[in-house]
Amino acid sequence: MKREYQEAGGSSGGGSSADMGSCKDKVMAGAAGEEEDVDELLAALGYKVRSSDMADVAQKLEQLEMAMGMGGVSAPGAADDGFVSHLATDTVHYNPSDLSSWVESMLSELNAPLPPIPPAPPAARHASTSSTVTGGGGSGFFELPAAADSSSSTYALRPISLPVVATADPSAADSARDTKRMRTGGGSTSSSSSSSSSLGGGASRGSVVEAAPPATQGAAAANAPAVPVVVVDTQEAGIRLVHALLACAEAVQQENFAAAEALVKQIPTLAASQGGAMRKVAAYFGEALARRVYRFRPADSTLLDAAFADLLHAHFYESCPYLKFAHFTANQAILEAFAGCHRVHVVDFGIKQGMQWPALLQALALRPGGPPSFRLTGVGPPQPDETDALQQVGWKLAQFAHTIRVDFQYRGLVAATLADLEPFMLQPEGEADANEEPEVIAVNSVFELHRLLAQPGALEKVLGTVHAVRPRIVTVVEQEANHNSGSFLDRFTESLHYYSTMFDSLEGGSSGQAELSPPAAGGGGGTDQVMSEVYLGRQICNVVACEGAERTERHETLGQWRNRLGRAGFEPVHLGSNAYKQASTLLALFAGGDGYRVEEKEGCLTLGWHTRPLIATSAWRVAAA
């Protein structure tokens, strides 16, 4: 029975024991052959790759490198991580020693469609923010989003072509390995110059990553899965921009420079989404904040800087009516104070190019009874190249006075600061003739007194010097703003509102001027506006980035100046309705002047844009004992 079973078993098994032994030997021989075929160098590293599969594995590794390299050349770290972030981090790759299968599984994951872009968060709350900073004035928390990536925003709603992972035949794949690869910026795809691939699948396990040719991009985009497109809402971005500026200023005030640095990096991206004046003023405030955060102060004045400052001042005079208004209203007050006087003396605390005085000289020349003898003392800072710029201004004014037959005398006083002036410097030279009429003095200051507030006691000394010469009138023109607050956040907020209105007026005035009189080719209309913006930008930088004696743009309001001058022994002089009417007429003649407003405030005149006063002119005299 046993033999029969064995025979039956043998016949049913299809072979004898000898045959089974030979099969076992063949299997062992095959395994040994496979072990001998494994690449020894990779085997030493723990990877089992047969020599016959080396070409296929090398091709797959090249494809994986190209696919992962498309994350962006401009920002390799963050961009590459963002591109392959959709790889399943929890995927278990069984037997990682099988390098060929492992790489192929990673390629299959890369070939999967990208996850959709999450929708933009609502304006009120941004869940993606990584830091929360309290807004200005304790008005709440501003949750600011991370800086927007320009590649994720578009204004044109068109299909976005995605990188295509397509299979290729072996011959094309072999040539692809020999060609030079290109890496382009984020959103573009890597391509091989000599490889050709189809959008359909192939029999080969190898694959290459390349951009679809132009003829097939439309079809590829149509077949690709829909990707949400983030469209920038300029109004929402504008709100976020203001929040970012205020939050950065608060972080600076709290000396949290890490948060301030993170916020200041978002401002240029948010400002780029805006247009017109908002973009420009935000750029200047962003630069000023960056200078303060990184402790990079503006360089000291040089020869080029001094000449450039004079050039900016001249362009600001031409582009907008603020300096014209200041000169006109001050001259009107001086002209009325000089009525009936035959010897007059004007002390100008900041003569610059002397643009204010030709109009006054002409008005005096047309006065009934003939012009008086006119003496002008111009005060200015020393020039870095040691040139006598003040004397050059005097020569030009003397030539003009000669043409209109006005007896004119000029003297220039070089002073690093107005606090260096003494009363005897402003008195007439030589002994006064007893038979001559005493000289009537007027002191004029246009945007000069606020600089003295950077030095303790300097303003009081200058006002004391002015009081000692007993002028008949003192004209003061200053910015109508409080940029001298001890709180940096309050000062920043006030200056942001002030200069935003100032930039709006430049935009509105230039557009109105272009409609009435379009500039000729190569004209200076655009240049005047650009240089005026730089003129204001330098003030912004000084208000925000500087502290201590370096911060000279310490503007104060009309009420604050009223208190300071009152304590120094001066009383206000009413400018009168005549000056108001003439100033309004001047603005009517200025192109684009519809938005400018002249207001009379407690005997003073202010010029502003719509409802916001921007500069104020006041007149003063020595108070009666």
Swiss-Prot record:
It holds the Pfam family GRAS. Residues 545-621 are annotated as: SAW. GO terms for molecular function: DNA-binding transcription factor activity; sequence-specific DNA binding. Keywords: Gibberellin signaling pathway, Nucleus, Phosphoprotein, Repressor, Transcription, Transcription regulation, Ubl conjugation. Residues 232-621 form the GRAS domain. Induction: Up-regulated following GA3 but not ABA application. A motif (DELLA motif) lies at residues 39-43. PROSITE patterns: GRAS. Residues 441-542 are annotated as: PFYRE. A motif (VHIID) lies at residues 344-348. The DELLA motif is required for its GA-induced degradation. This is DELLA protein SLR1. It comes from Oryza sativa subsp. japonica (Rice). The lineage of its organism: Eukaryota, Viridiplantae, Streptophyta, Embryophyta, Tracheophyta.
